[in-house]
Amino acid sequence: MKRTMLISLVFLVAIAALFGCKQQQQAQWSQGQAGQNQVVTPPAMIKSPQEVQQLESLAKANPKNANAWIALGNAQMDAQRFAEAIVSYQRSLELDPKNVDVRVDMGTCYRGVGQPEKAVEEYRKGMKIDPRHPMAHLNAGIVLSSDLGRKSEAVKEFEKYLELAPNAPNAADIRQDIQRMKSAK
């Protein structure tokens, strides 16, 4: 009994630390701390295979814990193991289908495995849940522009992003991109 309680406590502390850090990073990055023409992914926190393996064990031991699957997906994404992250994010969405952050991260992973249409689909699913999620619009704009060549759709997404985050550090760059795309028509 004590061992089970100890394992549960260790699990909760690990998840809280990882999930809390990821949420804080995402909040900082949602203000637009991103480079041009790349889907925005917060800086990698977890890279070692051992750390990912520990989170995988924790998620499998607690399969009904959405946060465990999110933490695993985040770690896999940070380690650029995008296909595995997609599976983990799908598991978390089975438990919490309205998590927009997970939808956006999963979209980024779809781009990472060369499926830009699926990436945009996930960003748009996130936008249906929360139309005011700036990163969904920014990342959709980037994929639409850079990967799919759908500039007019990209402009709309970038404009919505700027409406939601007008003072983002990358706002001037995004405005320039919009002007370039509009003048190229």
How would you label these PLM feature ranges?
Residues 61, 95, 129, 164-167:
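Structural marker of alpha-solenoid helical repeat scaffolds
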Residues 71, 105, 139, 174-177:
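Canonical tetratricopeptide repeat
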Residues 77, 104, 108-111, 145-146:
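Position-specific recognition of the canonical hydrophobic site in helix A of tetratricopeptide repeat
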Residues 58, 91-92, 125-126, 160-161:
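Canonical positions in the second alpha-helix
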